[in-house]
Amino acid sequence: MLAAELSPPLQRSRRIEALVAGYATSDGAGVRLTRLLTQKLQRRLDPFLMLDAFGSDDAEDYIAGFPDHPHRGFETITYMLDGRMRHRDSAGHEGVLGPGGVQWMTAGRGVIHSEIPEQTAGRMEGFQLWLNLPAADKMCVPWYRDFAAAELPAYRTAAGAAVTVIAGTSRDVQ
């Protein structure tokens, strides 16, 4: 069990200090995305390291994907809105993430992985959050799990908003 799983739930609210606009960039083999949380903000937002949003109807913006690259000491959580992305890593994990699905990867002591589109046309859209691991967990064994949309608990608020719970509990749904 990771130390983060033992942490008490957040008990107090914080005020918004500033609104920060994302900026257009590319990563991997040229995937166009919007970077919302950046290295400049990492110390202020730990454990949140980075948040990228990607989305395009033009396959040229995403088709090359994210070829083999290393990670260590943090987790990535990817949520797909549209499209299909294949994950493979050096620890032997593999999976395909489809619309509404979530992929959770703990890099721990280190992993080399790739994320390559499983499509050649159509919309590809989603976002990826990077979470810093506590110091005690930075050298843990790499771990991977993907969840299809049908496996994730969801509900609608009284106002009609759709909520999908990808971690923890929301309104007694977990």
What kind of feature is each model-predicted range?
Residues L2-R35:
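Hydrophobic alpha-helical membrane-insertion signals
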Residues Q128-A135, A148, V165-T169:
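Short, structured patches in soluble enzyme cores that scaffold and shape functional sites
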Residues M139-R145, V173-Q174:
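A short secondary-structure junction signal
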Residues A91-G98, P117-Q119, W143-D146:
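"Short basic amphipathic alpha-helical interaction patches in structured regions
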Residues S26-L81, L152-Q174:
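A short glycine-rich, His/Asp/Glu-containing loop-to-beta-strand
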Residues G108-D137:
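Ligand-binding loop in jelly-roll beta-barrel domains
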Residues I63, T78-G98, G108, I112:
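A short beta-strand-loop-beta hairpin characteristic of the jelly-roll/cupin
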